[in-house]
UniProtKB/Swiss-Prot annotation:
A metal cation binds at residues 48, 51. It comes from the Bacteria. Mg(2+) binds at residues 634, 638. This is Nitrogen fixation protein FixI. The gene is fixI. Keywords: ATP-binding, Cell membrane, Magnesium, Membrane, Metal-binding, Nitrogen fixation, Nucleotide-binding, Phosphoprotein, Plasmid, Translocase, Transmembrane, Transmembrane helix. The lineage of its organism: Bacteria, Pseudomonadati, Pseudomonadota, Alphaproteobacteria, Hyphomicrobiales. It comes from Rhizobium meliloti (strain 1021) (Ensifer meliloti). Its EC number is 7.2.2.-.
Length: 757
């Protein structure tokens, strides 16, 4: 199928067309660290599970490729590759040639592409042409069926042939190009049986016309193509509708911005050409093009895309802003801190597309089935033809039955069973403020029966307040703040905020996750953290969190803190209970503090004073007991248990390592994102199983009917197209059911009490 790429994209295909230079591909790739890079390519003529297997197989055969994944919904392939293999610098052009050798066009992905709209226009025009031709041929056929004489019948047959031929060539080019491309490279896809069926139907009709036969099936061949094109057009539209969350998010990024040069001159520059360090002017009413830091100006910023909150946030000099946020009231001068491809919007889009392309167990099964389905269909059609020839000896009837079998057994429904649900579910979760980093994570989340939550920053908002500052001397507070500067832990941040500006203390600094900070200075060894870490002993119990400042294990000061639970925490725990899920707390804080919070939230199982290793051990013990646990955590010390869990989640405020380790990231302050994500994932799993049942049930019923000769090619085309649309519409129920009956957002999910087991 031909698709028009943007002018920035250079097509790579057979026929000697120009391809991007190796250096261009290097610049377009993303550095992942560890000698790995990631490149995104568009593959506009990939349609089915066979295409996925072919492209991924061609790339994985390359020693430079670490992994490759095709996203059929966006028709893109993501390649993670090694910068060097055997001391030789990798040439990324090899990846494009490997794809082209399998018969697929490919070009560098450009965020500004609108090929989907062009394809939709081409499909609609093809539907119109085939529909017009089918209508006119049908009128001629009615005259023939009404008892026209032989000469008139032959004339009408020839007129029908002249109408059908160009219509099949023009409107059927989508199927013919794809089928020929597959056959030429020694493989099959779902368009091969369609092209065979349409061609055989037309060929048989032409043979009858030349031989002055009584019956011709030009109307059937063109009408068959008409219904097939309707199905493909609706499928394309439904996929686009399923991806509305991603396309809407992409539109939040402006095309460009005004860049201020050092000499004061201004230039409008495309967003892809903005580099870190550039000074930008963002006027009121404009969206922030890339992540940046405010150099001057004060304004209200709509950050709903970041945190889901409708209330504007005031930003001023020194504050950070994210790409896609809307500047409401005043002009801002920014310094870009990231390129467009590394900014917030690009990161979120990447997460959602990773969710779409994730290889969950069901999707692997569907892809494997679709890969072997096409050869099986051809064999079945051949056996059907041979069988009817042996039974009746009528070539025409045997051929018609074989054509019907070719059409009715198209694996479209099976290939769509999983990915379309993942697309809709990822979009639904995004609308609820939850980012999915891997499509398989939704499947794992639907299986959990236990939720283990960290305390500070997860069950609480992670902004503790120092409550006994009046009891601590300014000198000790300043010393503690100078040590706390080296940590992002919420308690360290609270000490810094209470002390004001503080210069970092000089010395050999070491942060021990789950314990505290140690600084070796000329005066001795300062420690700031838990009592056991700082002074090697226990102290009086209290219901407040504390941090001890010590010098050579001698206590200098005790800092006490209060932290507020996250909004809707208790309601979220109750919602988890209604889902039949047990809850527990994993915390490194003192037992009295954890017990008090657990009691207030109605959680009976809790663990206190745990090290990162002990948290992993608790999670492993739950797994050994047969439980599948979701771990929700935010800190550096939570990263090991997040990776060890069956599935994991972190708030957007989490430390970078925590967000990277988690499978889900929730953007809102409310903990209601947790039951919302579980409910959505469970419902998505139900729809996937339903889609499998629909696809398999369709084949179990339709294939025997076609083999027995009870379905004409036209009926087969209608049935095949309908099966694909049923699967897509069933997936779209996820949007309607959650919005109407199971909570439109995490907040309404909790307040309506709509979570059901």
């Amino acid at each position: 199928m031909s698709c028009c790429a943007s002018s920035a994209a250079i097509m790579v295909a057979e026929g000697g067309q120009a391809s991007p230079a190796s250096e261009e591909l290097w610049l377009a790739s993303r550095d992942l660290g560890g000698g790995l890079r990631q490149t995104e390519l568009s593959v506009p003529n990939a349609y089915c599970g066979t295409c996925i297997a072919t492209i991924e197989g061609a790339l994985r055969a390359k020693p430079e490729v670490e992994r490759a994944r095709v996203n059929l919904s966006s028709r893109r392939v993501s390649i993670v590759w090694k910068e060097e293999v055997g001391g030789r610098r990798t040439n990324p052009c090899d990846f494009l040639h490997a794809i082209a050798e399998r018969g697929y066009q490919t070009h560098l992905f450009s965020p500004g592409e609108e090929e989907g709209d062009d394809l939709l226009k081409q499909l609609i025009l093809a539907v119109a042409v085939s529909g017009f031709a089918a209508t006119n041929i049908m009128l001629l056929s009615v005259s023939v069926w009404s008892g026209a004489d032989a000469a008139t019948r032959d004339l009408f047959h020839w007129i029908s042939a002249l109408i059908a031929g160009p219509a099949l060539i023009y409107a059927g080019r989508f199927f013919y190009k794809s089928a020929w491309n597959a056959i030429r490279h020694g493989r099959t896809n779902m368009d091969v049986p369609i092209a065979l069926a349409v061609s055989l139907s037309y060929g048989m009709s032409l043979h009858e016309t030349i031989g002055h036969g009584e019956h011709a099936w030009f109307d059937a061949s063109v009408t068959l193509l008409f219904f097939l094109l309707i199905g493909r057009t609706l499928d394309h539209m439904m996929r686009g509708r399923a991806r509305t969350a991603i396309s809407g998010l992409a539109r939040l990024s402006p095309r460009g911005a005004t860049v201020v040069h050092p000499d004061g001159s201004r230039e409008y520059r495309a967003v892809d050409e903005i580099n870190p360090g550039d000074r930008l002017i963002v006027a009121a009413g404009e969206r922030v093009p890339v992540d940046g830091r405010v150099l001057s100006g004060t304004s209200d910023l709509d950050r709903s895309v970041v945190n889901g909150e409708s209330s504007p946030t005031v930003v001023t000099t020194g504050d950070t802003v994210q790409a896609g946020t809307l500047n409401l009231t005043g002009p801002l001068t920014l310094e870009a801190t990231a390129a467009a491809r590394d900014s917030f919007i690009a990161e979120i889009i990447g997460l959602m597309e990773a969710a779409e392309g994730g290889r969950a167990r069901y999707r692997r099964i569907a892809d494997r089935a679709a890969r072997y389905y096409s050869p099986a269909v051809h064999l079945l059609a051949l056996l059907t033809f041979v069988g009817w020839m042996l039974v009746e000896g009528d070539v025409r009837h045997a051929m018609l039955v074989a054509v019907a079998v070719l059409i009715i057994t198209c694996p479209c429904a099976l290939g769509l069973a999983v990915p379309v649900v993942q697309v809709v579910a990822a979009g639904r979760l995004f609308q609820g403020g939850v980012m999915v980093k891997d499509g398989s994570a939704m499947e794992r989340l639907a299986e959990i029966d236990t939720v283990l939550l960290d305390k500070t920053g997860t069950l609480t908002i992670g902004k503790p307040r120092l409550v006994n500052a009046h009891e601590i001397s300014p000198g000790r507070l300043a010393t503690a703040a100078a040590i706390a500067v080296h940590s992002r832990h919420p308690i360290a941040v609270a000490i810094q905020n209470s002390a004001g500006a503080a210069s970092p203390i000089a010395g050999d600094i070491r942060e021990i996750p789950g314990a505290g900070i140690e600084v070796k200075t000329e005066d001795g060894v300062y420690r700031l953290g838990s009592r056991d870490f700082a002074v090697g002993g226990s102290g009086p119990d209290g219901r407040q969190s504390e941090a001890i400042l010590s010098l050579d294990f001698r206590e200098l000061a005790c800092f006490r803190f209060e932290d507020q639970p996250r909004p809707a925490s208790r309601e979220s725990i109750e919602a988890l209970g209604r889902l039949g899920i047990a809850t527990g707390i994993l915390s490194g804080d003192r037992a009295p503090v954890v017990a008090a919070l657990a009691s207030s939230l109605g959680i009976s199982n809790w663990y206190a004073e745990l090290s990162p290793r002990e948290k992993v051990q608790v999670c492993a013990a739950a797994a050994e007991a047969g439980h599948k646990a979701l771990v929700v955590g935010d800190g550096i010390n939570d990263a090991p248990v997040l990776r060890a869990a069956h599935v994991s989640m972190a708030p957007a405020t989490a430390a970078d390592v925590g967000r990277q380790a988690a499978d889900f990231v929730f953007m809102h302050e409310r903990l209601s994102a947790v039951p919302f994500a579980i409910e959505t994932s469970r419902h998505a799993g139900q729809l996937i199983r339903q889609n499998f049942a629909l696809a398999i049930g369709y084949n179990v019923i339709a294939v025997p009917i076609a083999i027995l000769g009870y379905a004409t090619p036209l009926v087969a085309a209608v049935a095949m197209s309908s099966s694909s649309l049923v699967v897509v519409f069933n997936a779209l129920r996820l949007k309607r059911s959650l919005a109407a009956g199971r909570g439109a957002t995490p907040g309404t999910l909790i307040h309506s009490g709509a979570v059901t087991s």
